[in-house]
């Protein structure tokens, strides 16, 4: 604007990236590391529906609103879940091939594609990139989807809830922090001894807890209200999933007790000719809105047609604030007290914000009651979520 306010979504996002870069460098300097740049990376999983163009043209509500306003329950929906990761239909496969070709021409690193849970629902996921570039590429992807669908007699629906009775669409925001190409959220083989990782982990947990209202507000929309908390997407209550191993590390730090590491479980398939498989330790119940999945956090509340600038701007800025608090706390600390002071800060931070950690079932009836006892917000709708924008 003429008076200097940012009216777009790009500028606040870039400012948040600069803030996180600045504060993360300060934290790394505390650990004796000089890096050129720290960036946040994003890998957005884009869900969408494809229907026949003639069916789309016959529905004014789809044309005008992007979703159906009335209709009957389908004879067959998603009861058997056989559509999920099933064989892709030839017409859809041709659409996906052309979409890949067009996206690659634009340097969009489109990678995986598959059928989703609901009939006619699909997903495309790219290789992760720096946040700003990844979000630009996601917007290009959404635009190309609509254009290319018409080449195959199809219409692409990007609304969060185009049809009742079946799942809606979201866009998982896979977020991490990278310093000169090294992932700072990699816990290593011994996360309990990795002080640098514990500082970043504690900072992120504290950021999400202190700014859960803004996190919820950043994904608020009329379309997203149809799916959040409807047993097809995370609840509207913000919580952090860490997995059993990291949760045990956090518990040991908070309670000053030794951490008992758990050897990775092997799955016995009962077939001697097949190699043993290591059991996955990441979150598979999909009910957590903000889950640690190996070496990144997955923010699952974002809507399918949403510009991801808002949630990433909030997340980057909130984490930068906590990293600044740690770097300031460590100023002037002598080397002899370094480990003690770092562990003290991590313990105090995790203790103050442990209420946001929840590894259970977010769909359960007991969770909203438990969340209320913990003092967590439950802003179920957009009108509930937006008033925090007026807070100072």
Please name every model-derived segment.
Residues 1-158, 166-171, 176-392:
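Glycine-rich, acidic/polar active-site loops that bind/position phosphate-bearing ligands
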Residues 162:
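Glycine-rich N-terminal segment of FAD-binding domains in flavoprotein oxidoreductases
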